[in-house]
């Protein structure tokens, strides 16, 4: 029986290693895709600059130069509306009675109509003509009428004045030309107009073709431009011009802001897409310039964001004008990106990467073997059926993969790998502890304890990083990079390993004087555990565990518990000094627990304490693997984050060692005093 068990485990280990190599190769290909897309586009509102010039008593050219010097590469151009055209001195809009008072010589003016005239400039005439063209597409012939009488040129429009003034008229060709003439790229932000004619779509592309500086399209509102009738034509038209569709990251940082038709349009464009980070003005005003810059910078390097849309502060800061205030925090983003190896310019578009199907199939086989190995660790009696379970799992997974091509299978296997990797790694550590449990501390000493702990930590960490290759390899394709699809079960990757390692632990170490080796033993263990007397100290301990659980589970995922200011400061410090900021639960909690758990083993501390320390070790290893579940984060960043966590955890071990030494001295001191009483 034991020989069969060893044979099964060796076979599974070989399959796991082969699968991990396939996952690592896919991850290497993924790294090259991500490394080739290192340019971030910095976008600011074109109209904000025009509006600020008059208020700040400067010229628009001076403001354009200010923003260019401070990192802005592109100008966002929105749909025009009559109100904006009036404010920019291109047209005049009158109610009927106002127009009649100004032009009594013109007959047939109706008080309930709206009248539009150009401003007497070359730009006014150009914009007036383009406005007439747009209105003819959005209104029927009976609703728009041209007037030319006694040298007066005007348009008569039927409508409600207040609503008409804010009515979107579409992207104007002249605005695109003017924005592009200042040396910036132009990012268009069209809103959908329900049931607009095909000519309106054609007019949009006429505006797109007005400048070779158009670098992207960000749809405005809850629908993509052209929805529903012409969304495919819009997608194809943009693709033919090599203009990417920009997808706005959701506020939760998971997926995108919902826009009807967006995912279909993304597929029609062959995934010629860019991820964008935008912050609301209400959020911006809560932050100082340094923190605002940090938010954009972290989004770019950690979440494959390749376009930033910068909002404006509501008020100027530090004795600067509002434009100087905005330019300063944008410059902070640019400087940090360039120091990190990025460049600013036209947004990089990732290649539409999909791994070779056979290679992914090998990674799947390894993930299945990892799950089966974990099952056998949890229920050793199943080892006699290990070959059968493995065969059924492999055949079932591969048949589903090759026949159905469903993402849910990949997501389930990735979840299984993320859960099982820390369980297997910590189980190996437990096996090591079993061999060492009879070793006295006098044979070890503090120096050897530290060295042994460091070696075990790095050994476990490397194994966890190897296991993480399954998560990365299984989910590596453009849909997951852009988060059109994503890893499912983040909370489970935190909770399930703790439950499973507890099952493994009670089979290896005695609780209540006996290990659990059968169903009856487990039932007896549960009964004894439930009959533990609740004392004040235990309640206090449970309260501490509850707080830790809240921080550990509640802070995971994308909608976690709030982060205190002192921790934000620590994070920003680590971001400044390290390539990738490690997770606190790894280097401050899980990794130092390796040393303390060994100290507990050698000094024969209570078994319950040793168990909780093993749980802490599992948290650290699980967190390393879970990092790779965020497929929007570049592979190299997740990998280096794991290494940085191990390095920082090694330093934290020094503090843990000192704390244990002090604790031992204190208990010895008070124990001796108590013994003399």
Model-derived regions: residue spans:
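Hydrophobic secretory-pathway targeting helix
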Residues: 1-52, 73
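Arginine residue identity/basic-tract feature
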Residues: 2-5, 10, 30, 57, ...
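Alpha-helical transmembrane segments of integral membrane proteins
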Residues: 3-22, 365-677
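Soluble extramembrane regions of membrane proteins in the secretory/endomembrane system
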Residues: 33-357
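Non-cytosolic juxtamembrane linkers/loops
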Residues: 312-391, 397-410
């Amino acid at each position: 029986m034991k020989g069969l068990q060893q044979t099964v485990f060796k076979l599974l280990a070989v399959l796991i290693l082969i699968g991990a190599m396939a996952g690592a190769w896919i991850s290497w290909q993924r790294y090259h895709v991500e490394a080739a897309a290192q340019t971030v586009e910095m976008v600011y509102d074109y109209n904000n600059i025009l509006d600020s010039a008059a208020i700040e008593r400067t010229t628009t050219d001076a403001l354009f130069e200010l923003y260019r010097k401070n990192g802005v590469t592109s100008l966002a151009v929105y749909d025009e509306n009559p109100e904006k055209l009036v404010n920019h001195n291109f047209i005049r809009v009158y109610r009927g009675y106002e127009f009649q008072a100004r032009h009594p010589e013109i007959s047939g003016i109706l008080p309930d109509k709206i009248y539009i005239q150009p401003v007497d400039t070359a730009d006014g005439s150009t914009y007036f003509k383009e406005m007439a063209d747009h209105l003819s597409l959005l209104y029927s012939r009976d609703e728009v009428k041209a007037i030319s009488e006694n040298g007066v040129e005007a348009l008569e429009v039927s409508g409600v004045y207040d609503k008409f003034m804010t009515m979107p008229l579409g992207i104007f060709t002249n605005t695109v030309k003017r924005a592009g003439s200042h040396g910036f790229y132009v990012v268009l932000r069209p809103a959908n107009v329900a049931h607009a004619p095909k000519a309106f779509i054609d007019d949009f592309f006429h505006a797109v073709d007005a400048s070779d500086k158009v670098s992207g399209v960000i749809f405005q509102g809850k629908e993509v431009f052209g929805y529903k009738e012409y969304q495919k034509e819009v997608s194809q038209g943009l693709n033919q011009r090599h203009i990417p569709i920009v997808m706005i990251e959701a506020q939760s940082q998971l997926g995108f802001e919902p826009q009807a038709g967006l995912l279909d349009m993304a597929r029609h464009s062959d995934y010629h897409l860019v991820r964008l980070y935008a912050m609301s003005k209400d959020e911006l005003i809560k932050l100082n310039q340094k923190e605002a810059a940090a938010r954009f910078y972290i989004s770019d390097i950690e979440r494959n964001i390749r376009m930033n849309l910068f909002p404006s502060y509501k008020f100027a800061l530090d004795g600067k004008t509002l434009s100087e205030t905005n330019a300063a925090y944008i410059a902070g983003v640019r400087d940090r990106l360039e120091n990190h190896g990025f460049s600013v310019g036209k947004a990089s578009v990732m290649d539409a990467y999909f791994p070779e199907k056979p290679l992914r199939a090998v990674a799947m086989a390894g993930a299945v073997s990892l799950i089966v190995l974990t099952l056998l660790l949890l229920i050793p009696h199943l080892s006699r059926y290990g070959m059968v379970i493995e065969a059924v799992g492999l055949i079932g997974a591969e048949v589903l993969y090759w026949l159905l091509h469903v993402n849910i299978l990949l997501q389930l296997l990735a979840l299984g790998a993320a859960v099982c990797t820390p369980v297997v790694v910590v189980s190996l550590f437990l096996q090591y502890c079993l061999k060492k449990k009879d070793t006295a501390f006098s044979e070890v000493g503090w120096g050897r304890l530290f060295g042994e702990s460091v070696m075990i930590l790095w050994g476990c960490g490397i194994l966890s990083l190897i296991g993480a290759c399954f998560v990365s390899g299984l989910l590596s394709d453009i849909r997951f990079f852009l988060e059109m699809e994503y890893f499912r079960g983040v909370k489970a990757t935190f909770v399930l390993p703790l439950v499973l390692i507890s099952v493994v632990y009670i089979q290896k170490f005695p609780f209540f004087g006996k290990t659990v080796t059968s169903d009856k033993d487990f039932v007896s263990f549960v009964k004894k555990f439930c009959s533990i007397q609740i004392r004040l100290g235990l309640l206090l301990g449970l309260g501490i565990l509850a707080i830790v659980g809240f921080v550990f589970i509640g802070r995971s995922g994308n909608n976690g518990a709030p982060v205190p200011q002192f921790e934000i400061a620590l994070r920003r410090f680590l971001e400044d000094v390290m390539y990738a900021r490690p997770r606190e639960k790894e280097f401050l909690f899980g990794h130092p627990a390796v040393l303390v758990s060994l100290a507990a083993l050698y000094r024969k501390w209570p078994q319950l304490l040793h168990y909780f320390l093993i749980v802490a070790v599992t948290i650290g290893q699980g967190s390393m693997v879970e990092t790779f579940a965020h497929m929007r984060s570049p592979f190299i960043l997740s990998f280096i984050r794991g290494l940085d966590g191990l390095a920082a955890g090694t330093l934290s071990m020094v503090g843990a060692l000192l704390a244990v030494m002090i604790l031992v001295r204190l208990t010895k001191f008070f124990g001796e005093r108590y013994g003399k009483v």
